[in-house]
């Protein structure tokens, strides 16, 4: 919810140096949230509708909690920020705080990939990184369902912010060469647009930096150097998530945003 990019200054918000700084900070945020999450087992029960009885709701425990959390957060303006996208838009309420007057930064668009993020995170990623304690789920009386869900929400919102930041990159690229991108958009050449915003060297730097961070943050710094210790999270799984999911999905967001860039705004 915090932002190193000043959304009150449209020029600064679209400065690639400042965007890059924010993306690097989000690597830290995501890494720490994931390390917190893997203290707990997968706890599949919380994602299964009907597995936990909730009065007047057919949602899973996790979705119910997430809905309520975003409802509360909307009251304090979280989703007024141009870089925040709710997983449950129907939960968003009118803020109790006076509105912040953000300038126009992004072109109007409908690009939101939160459903893809949540599905991948719950169904693909968590089973790879959550610890196996060698026992069955012991149920709501003994498992940390609330703490697990709280960690999940933090992870998912940070991932959403990281991935949707691609819109700011795309808008910055468009403004740097509108004639070039207009031709590609009019030709509906998604492949060429994707190639124009891809930098393999930068992607490698991101993955190398992320690996170092996960390895570093996943250890106890108080132990003597050279002392063997287990790392708190599966480093390869986190790096793979970025390589095979976060980076490609960010690129998809960038391309689809640009495909809507020429649509007249009302």
Swiss-Prot record:
Knockout consequences: RNAi-mediated knockdown decreases chorismate mutase activity. RNAi-mediated knockdown decreases cell population growth rate. RNAi-mediated knockdown decreases antifungal activity against Fusarium oxysporum and Botrytis cinerea.
GO molecular function: chorismate mutase activity
Domain Chorismate mutase, chain residue ranges per copy: 7-263
EC number assigned by the record: 5.4.99.5
Pfam families documented for this protein: CM_2
Keywords, comma-separated and alphabetical: Allosteric enzyme, Amino-acid biosynthesis, Aromatic amino acid biosynthesis, Cytoplasm, Isomerase, Phenylalanine biosynthesis, Tyrosine biosynthesis
Binding of L-tryptophan, residues: 144, 146-147
GO annotation, cellular component aspect: cytoplasm
Transcription in keyword set: no
Stored SUPFAM superfamilies: Chorismate mutase II
Pathway: Metabolic intermediate biosynthesis; prephenate biosynthesis; prephenate from chorismate: step 1/1
Gene3D superfamilies noted in UniProt: Chorismate mutase, AroQ class superfamily, eukaryotic
GO BP of this protein: chorismate metabolic process; L-phenylalanine biosynthetic process; tyrosine biosynthetic process
Primary role: Catalyzes the Claisen rearrangement of chorismate to prephenate. Acts at the first branch point in the aromatic amino acid pathway where it steers biosynthesis towards phenylalanine and tyrosine, and away from tryptophan.
Quaternary structure (record): Homodimer.
Record's protein name: Chorismate mutase
Originating organism: Trichoderma parareesei
Phylogenetic placement of the source organism: Eukaryota, Fungi, Dikarya, Ascomycota, Pezizomycotina
Gene: ARO7
